[in-house]
């Protein structure tokens, strides 16, 4: 890394030290200021930052920071979901009070465009979202603006999160009829996973590599052949905020596309499809992964101009 990159990592580590000393991660002036500083530090795209190659100390800070961000995000969503459900009219008419609502609108549009391209016009009838939380904005945005006839099943292990989320949509005559909430550990869900055309996996379900891969393996075992798995990942300095999903974490899936936003949408998006027959071991050895090149120029025209599409050429050369 160059001097500027080292300074960036040091700034992130300094912010971690300050955040780790907070008495609470619930929304407050101090919490809001520090997390805004952290996000603004990590958002600028920087391909020179590869968190997987950093020293053990920075790796440990990163893992701790991801956990802290997950807790803070949960508190933030809980806070705003509680406010929204206090409205006498339809709470979904006031979603713009959530400070990151516009990011979810952009992310929802991006993910819908990816689905539209890779499903060749097929509209999913049933979608699962794993790790939906108290403010299930991805499901709400997709159901409201993009998949207007699709049924959404939201899974979360926290009963209080599901109670808030269910109350949030209960006043909407359309969404309330198409959105369902299940309080369960997804590792205990088996047969019903076969009924979904698309499964979304939230960024913070599986906060480290081992946990994430364990969930992916479970989904691969029980999802229907040909079903789509959408995942959130992170790239560059943004990987200090969210876990990274690598193509080779997706054994038994064909990775169709990986998109790295360069605007204020933090998460990268990985879209994959379960193989009808697991044949990964036949390509370059048991630990290799299959990649299908996408029509980048066609897709890029549909995306926000600030989105960056990862090139697959280098990866494909490695596999050949």
From Swiss-Prot:
Tissue distribution: In shoots.
One function term, GO molecular function aspect: nicotianamine synthase activity
GO terms for biological process, alphabetical: nicotianamine biosynthetic process; phloem transport; pollen development; pollen tube growth
Keywords: S-adenosyl-L-methionine, Transferase
EC number: 2.5.1.43
Induction remarks: Constitutively expressed.
Disulfide bridges in this chain: none
EC class: transferase
Family in the record: Belongs to the nicotianamine synthase (NAS)-like family.
Protein task: Synthesizes nicotianamine, a polyamine which serves as a sensor for the physiological iron status within the plant, and/or might be involved in the transport of iron.
Protein name (database record): Nicotianamine synthase 3
Biological classification of the source: Eukaryota, Viridiplantae, Streptophyta, Embryophyta, Tracheophyta
